[in-house]
Amino acid sequence: MKNILIFPFLSISTGHHHVADALQAELESQGLAAEKIDIFSHSYRRLEKLSSVAYLKWIQYFPKTYSGIYRLLACGEFQHDKRYFMYEWLFTQQMRHILQEKQPDIAFCTHALPSYLLNRLKPEYPNLTVVNVYTDFFVNQLWGRKNIDYHFVPSTEVKKQLISEGIDQNNIYLTGIPVHQNFEMESADTLQHHPPYTIIITGGSMGVGGILKWVQELSPGGKILYKILCGRNEKLYSYVKSLHHPLIEAIPYLHSKAEMNRLYEQATGIMTKPGGVTISECLQKRLPVFIYHALPGQEEMNLNLLHERKLVTDMRNWDMQKAEEYIAAFFQSNEQMKEYKKHVNGYLGEMSDRKIKDVLKRIIWKQKNTLLK
């Protein structure tokens, strides 16, 4: 039996955890147990909780500062010899303890920090297979490169970037951002071609971003039924319920991926923020995506890349009173819908390794054969 670890980061429910859950579910479906470990809460539980709150407050109240610092520290041209001494000081010994205690055969990293640490520690653990699983549509400088065995990449652009940085193309898999197996079944063309269209609005579960403001400015005209996915945001849920509007529905926290998949199946399109996992789920389901807000840092970067490839519609500068007309016109336009499908099919067609279960089987088989040599 393989000993498999998955490393997200922080305890807040971000894309790192959703991808970790997707990998864990896929491995378990193959009869393999995998343990998720957040090195921060594992090592400094109280500090992690404080840091999570501080992070959310920072991006909420000082978005430009966060964006600037993120671009300065995490973006730009990759430097092979760049060191992050604070991270090493805080977490290297903690990671060693985890590796010594758990004795993993394979480690999947869904966040850059554990990837950085394992990249540095890998020479001490030559039999350990380390896999980077990228959860955004770009790769920042912190992710480990040199000693990482495999890379699950979101696009051909990222594959080309990694090859230019010296990564062997045979170790790169074009998986897209992995989504839970519940979302992998592609929908038939069930999009409504006449109003009222069903639009899911999501992206407010953590209480940051512009979702409440957006909902407050909704002006339903009968062409769209809005379903607001509130998650654990009680303030948002209470507000939407208090409207008592027949065309604005509050959806409480969903307890399973199957429930979310059913909601996707009922939808004509999605209004959301450009988080890597949500966008990947929508692309998988071929649901048109309208972006109403982007958090500083990763989401800004994602949006730029997605907009460039015409995979999403940026509605941040739309006249709110006319937004419903614009969206309805999009669905009623054969030309716009055809163009959208062309770009999405083009993107999905590039994902030569989309069946994540097959990629996992291949990696596990290779790891087993390596140990037998």
From Swiss-Prot:
Q: Which GO terms describe its cellular component?
A: membrane
Q: What are the UniProt keywords, alphabetically?
A: Glycosyltransferase, Transferase
The UniProt record lists the EC number as 2.4.-.-
Q: Does the keyword Signal apply?
A: no
Do you know which Pfam families this protein is assigned to?
MGDG_synth
**Bilayer-spanning residue ranges:** none
Instruction: Name the InterPro entries for this protein.
Output: Diacylglyc_glucosyltr_N, Glycosyltransf_28_UgtP
Q: What class of enzyme is it?
A: transferase
Classification via PANTHER family: MONOGALACTOSYLDIACYLGLYCEROL SYNTHASE (PTHR43025), MONOGALACTOSYLDIACYLGLYCEROL SYNTHASE 1, CHLOROPLASTIC (PTHR43025:SF3)
Family (UniProt): Belongs to the glycosyltransferase 28 family.
> How is this protein named in the record?
Uncharacterized glycosyltransferase YkoN
Q: Which organism is it from?
A: Bacillus subtilis (strain 168)
Q: State the taxonomy lineage.
A: Bacteria, Bacillati, Bacillota, Bacilli, Bacillales
Gene, per the UniProt record: ykoN
